[in-house]
Amino acid sequence: PESETYGRIPNRYVNKDDVIYNTADGNLWFVREVWEYLQYTGDVDFLNSMWDVIKLAIESDIKNRTDEFGFLLHGDADTWMDARIKGQQPLSPRGSRANDIQVLWYTTLMIGSNIAKYLNQEEISNEWKEKANTVKVNFISYFLNEEKNMIADCLKEKNTQDFAIRPNLFFTFSVPKLLDK
C-alpha cells in the first residue's frame, strides 16, 4: 500500500523484477473495458469477480495520484505519447496533467460510479460521481480557453495552459463527451 505503484496496472510485465509502470491510463482503460464487456455480454459474475480490482485501481489513483483539483497526475511521458529521445527526454513532454488522461479519468470515475451502483455500493457510487463532477468542473475551468476557443493539451506548472496541437484533443469530444459545447 505504500508503494507509488500500488494499485496500478503495469504497462509491461516480464517478471516480478521487470515491471514497467510508465502508463497513466492502464487503470483507466481497464475499468472502461470491464464496463464495455458487461454492456456487451451481461456477465455479472465477471463484473463481481473484477469489483475488488476496479475498486483498488480507482481508490489508489484517488489516494496516490490526484491533485487538489481532482486531476489525475502522471509522468511527463506516461501518456500513449511516451516516446523518448535516446530513452531519456520525452519527445512530446506533456507535464503531469494531459487532457486525454483527465477525460479518461472522468470517464473512469463515472463508470466506476455506475458499476458501484449496479453492485449496490451506493456510498462508493456517490463518492466517485462527486469526484467525477469535480474533475469536469475543473477541466472546464483550467483546460478550456474561451477567448482562444481552444482546449489546452495539458497544464504545465502553475496551471499554465499548453496549446500544442496534438491528436489527444479528440478524446475530449468522444470518451465521453465532457464538454457541453
Stretches found by the model and what they are:
Residues R65-H74, G95-R97, L104-K181:
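Catalytic cores of carbohydrate-active enzymes
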Residues P1-G75, A98-Y106:
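Aromatic-rich carbohydrate-recognition surfaces in CAZymes
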